[in-house]
């Protein structure tokens, strides 16, 4: 079955966006080869439409054009670029080529399919907090994304200074579910600095990206870790009514930690969409379920109350945490609902 056809309004918007991109391309500053210096290595600090900020090996960041032959360029890409002998309209060079990526962070896009948003990530830092609430479902969604992308996760629970002793014990018990699965878990407070040295050590010599819903303190943590002072990543107050903050960043950007290591701050990872995945990919994304895949009595087992279900039997024995089992089914149900809203069938992915 084919994907649902775009409405006339959607077709007009797609066409208008295409024409606007063409117009921007035509207005780019063009370089003659004689105007350019020798090829150099660099890393993409940020991407702005038809331009990119490139950090050279000398640490200087220059805004560059992008060769039309480059089909994909995102923050974190390692590139070959050439500086101009002089700046033209604020542009200081051109990106010539992109090195192969060892990892790429993607998110699903309704119009463009799977869209890359960052490259060469070593780990995804999943930031959660006890306020507005501790959501294991959100943590599990991020873990499925990490496992699917094959990028190592690090769970960071923020705002622990707001916990009393009894609440701390309950939260610790919840985190033990992930520790038992060999996931790294850190309990921190950007306010009291508790756990910050351990977090700095986990970030050293790696390229990380922070993920988490608004209001969990990602920007506050980054400001503290980066020691930005007055040059801060924007932080919004948490809404008194909803308990949720607002978006605080607009473009992906790479920053260097003073203690070593890098971080890509990206608005595209507030919440990973999973609707493009197949149910089998979600099952594999729960690492404790993998050993039972293919062991059920029926091939089309839904892993609920189906007779002969190996996964449900493991849950009943206590080999699979009830919380994780329930979140697994919640994720599958939410994927079905999103696909229905977006007009996809189960065979369209």
From Swiss-Prot:
It is found in: Cytoplasm. Keywords: Cytoplasm, GTP-binding, Hydrolase, Metal-binding, Nucleotide-binding, Ribosome biogenesis, RNA-binding, rRNA-binding, Zinc. GTP binds at residues 158-161, 212-220. Residues 102-272 form the CP-type G domain. Residues 1-11 have a biased composition (Basic residues). Binds 1 zinc ion per subunit. Its main location: cytoplasm. Coiled coil: none annotated. Transmembrane segments: none annotated. InterPro entries: G_CP_dom, NA-bd_OB-fold, P-loop_NTPase, Ribosome_biogen_GTPase_RsgA, RsgA_GTPase_dom. Its EC number is 3.6.1.-. One of its GO terms (cellular component) is cytoplasm. One of its GO terms (biological process) is ribosomal small subunit biogenesis. Its cofactor is Zn(2+). One of several proteins that assist in the late maturation steps of the functional core of the 30S ribosomal subunit. Helps release RbfA from mature subunits. May play a role in the assembly of ribosomal proteins into the subunit. Circularly permuted GTPase that catalyzes slow GTP hydrolysis, GTPase activity is stimulated by the 30S ribosomal subunit. Belongs to the TRAFAC class YlqF/YawG GTPase family. RsgA subfamily. This is Small ribosomal subunit biogenesis GTPase RsgA. It comes from Pectobacterium atrosepticum (strain SCRI 1043 / ATCC BAA-672) (Erwinia carotovora subsp. atroseptica).
